[in-house]
C-alpha cells in the first residue's frame, strides 16, 4: 500500500520516521560503496523504540475496539513493522562485523522500507477505523431524516427533533474535529462547507414540516403538494450534504484536485494570464503557432462575452474588436506562408494585434461591469414582489394571474443573476479559487430558488396560515442572503472603475430624463420611476465603493472613499422626497427647481466616488509603446554573462535541461512540472527580485530530482541525491514562504493578500510530504517490488506537480500583490521587470 499522510497526525508521526529512514538509506549506499564507517546500532535502536511504542499503542486499541475490520487489518501491519525492526537490528549487527556483508545490506534496505511502509499501513488502519465511526454517525442521521416525511402532527415533530438532536450534534462534533486535521485544504473546505449547509437547513426543515402539519390539519385546504415539495426539498438537501461529508471523510488523497467546471471555469486566472502573455509575445514580434493559437482563444472568449452582453452597443464593440483581431491574424498567417514572418510588415502587424488584443481585453472588462450594473441593481425586488403577490387579499380578482406573473419574473431574475455570476467567474480574470466560489454561490442561488415559488404558492392557497408565511419568510431570507453574498463576490471581481463609469453614465441619463419630465409636467409615475432608478443605481455605487474600501488597507484612500460615499448617501433621500413633492405639486416651479438641484447633487456624489477610485487606480495593463518604424531589425547587443555559468555544475546541467526541448510529459512528468515553473519565472529579470531567483533555484533542483527519480545517475548515487535534493527543495520552499509572506503582509489590497496567503498555506504541507515521498521512493528503488516502486513514483510525481503548480501560482499572486505595497515596507524595493519588455505588470483583478 502506498504511504499515506492525509491527516496532520499521520504526517507528524511519519515525518521523523522518514528522516531516520532516509539516514538508513544513505548508510546503505555507503555500504554499497564500501565507505560505511559508522556503527548503525544507535540509530537502529532509536527506530526500534519508536516501533515498539507504536505497536504497543496499536495492540491496546485492538483489545478495546469493537471494529472487526480494524481487528483484522491491524495485526498484519504490526507484524510487518516488527519484522522490519528485526531486519534493521540484524543489519546493524552484520554490517558492524562486515561492512560488505550482502545480507546486511539487503536487510538494511528491506528494514528501512518495511519500517516506513509498515508504520504508514498501521496508522492508516487506525485512521480508517476512526473514519468508519464517523461515517456510522452520519448514516444514522441520514437514515432518520426519512421519518420527517411521515410527520403529520406537531406533537410528532417535537418527538422527531428530540430524537434527531443527539445524532446531529454528534455528527457536527466529529466533522468539526476532522476538517482541521486534513492536510488537503480543499477537502477540509468541503467538509466545512457541507457542515454549514446542514446547519443552515435544519431550521428550514423544521419550518417546512410545521407547514405540512398545519395544511394537513386544515380540512379541504389546498397547497399540500407545494408544502410537501418544500419539506422534501430540504430533506434532500440535507441528505446530499451528509452524503458529501461521508464521501470526503473517506478520501485519502493529499494533492489538490484540479477545478472542473464549464466553459472557461477551470482556468479563470489562466485566461487572464493568457491575454497578457499573448500581448507580450505579439509586442516582441513573436508570431509563432502557440502565440497565434493563444490569441484565437482570446478572440473566442471575446465573442462568448459578446453573446451575453447587456446592450447591443457593447456587443457590437466586442464583436468588432474580435473581428479586427481575427483579420490581423489572417494577414500574419499569409505573410508566414510567403516566408515573410520576420519582415517589417509582419512586425507591424504583430504590434497592431497586441494593441487590438489589449482593446479586446478592456472591452471584456467593460462588458462585465455593464452586465453587473444592469442585473444587480435591484437584487431583492422580484422576490419581494413575489411575496407581496402571495400575500394579496383573497378578494383581489387578479390575484392568481398576478402571482403567476411575479413567479415567472422571479425565476427569470434568479437565472439572470446566476448566469452573470458564472460569466464573471469564467471571464473576470479572478483567481481560480474565487471563480470556483462564485460558481458555487450561483449554483446555491439556483437551488434555493426552486423552493421559493412553491413556498409562496402555499401562502397564496392558504392566506391565513401563519406557519406558511413564516416558512416563506425563512426561504426568502435565505435566498436574499445567497443573492447578496454572490453580489458581494461579483463586486469584488469586476473592474470597479468601469462599474463606476457605467453607473455614472446611466445615472446622468436618468437624471436628465427625470428633470425633463418634472419641468414639462408630464406623467408623474414616470418621474417616480426615474427617481427610483437613480436611487437604486446610486445605492449600488455605494455598495461597490464599500467593497473597495473594505478591500483596502490604505487609510488615506479608505477615508476619502468613505467620505465621498457618505455624501452620496445623504443626497439620495432628499432627491426622492423632492420627486414626490413634484408629483404632489406638478406646477410648482420652486419645487421643480429643488428637485433638479437635489438630482444634480446625486450626480455630483457619484462623480466624486468615481473620482476617488480613479485617483487610486492601477491600470491592469498600461498602453503598449508605439512601434518604431525601421527598415531592418537592429543588431542585438552582445549577450550578458550567462547566469547559468555562475552555477555549480549540477545546476548548470539542470539549466540546460530546462531550456532544452521538452520530452513528452508522460515520459518525465516531474521535469515537465519543473520546466513549467522555470519558464514562468524566466519571463522576469532576476535582478532586484529575490523571489524569482529563488523559484528558479527550486525549478533547477526539481529538474535534477526528476533525473535521480528515474535512476539516470546510477542506482547508488540516485538514492542519496534524491533524498538530498528533496530536502534542499523543501528548504527553498520555506525561504519562498518567508519571502512571499513579507509581500503579503505589506500588501494593502486584501483580495490580493488573501489570494497569496491561501496559496502559501499549501507550501508547508507539500514540502514536508516531498521529503517523505522522496525517502519512500529511495527505499523502493532496486527493491525488487515493481508495484511498490510504481506507487512510490506516482505519489512523488503527484507531489512534485502540486508543489510546482503552487509555486507558479505564487509567482503570479506575488506580482499582483506587489502593485499595492506599503511604500515604507522593506519588501517594496522588489522589482518586477519583464525581460526585454517595459516592465508591465499584471494587476490583481478588482
From Swiss-Prot:
One of its GO terms (biological process) is cell adhesion. It is found in: Cytoplasm, Cell cortex; Cell projection, Filopodium; Cytoplasm, Cytoskeleton. Pfam families: Vinculin. InterPro entries: Alpha-catenin/vinculin-like_sf (IPR036723), Vinculin (IPR017997), Vinculin/catenin (IPR006077). One of its GO terms (molecular function) is actin filament binding. Its main location: cytoplasm. Residues 315-370 form a coiled coil. One of its GO terms (cellular component) is cortical cytoskeleton. Keywords: Actin-binding, Cell projection, Coiled coil, Cytoplasm, Cytoskeleton. The keyword Coiled coil applies. Residues 617-646 are annotated as: Disordered. Actin filament (F-actin)-binding protein which may play a role in cell-cell adhesion. Monomer. Interacts with TLN (talin); the interaction facilitates VIN1 binding to F-actin. Belongs to the vinculin/alpha-catenin family. This is Vinculin.
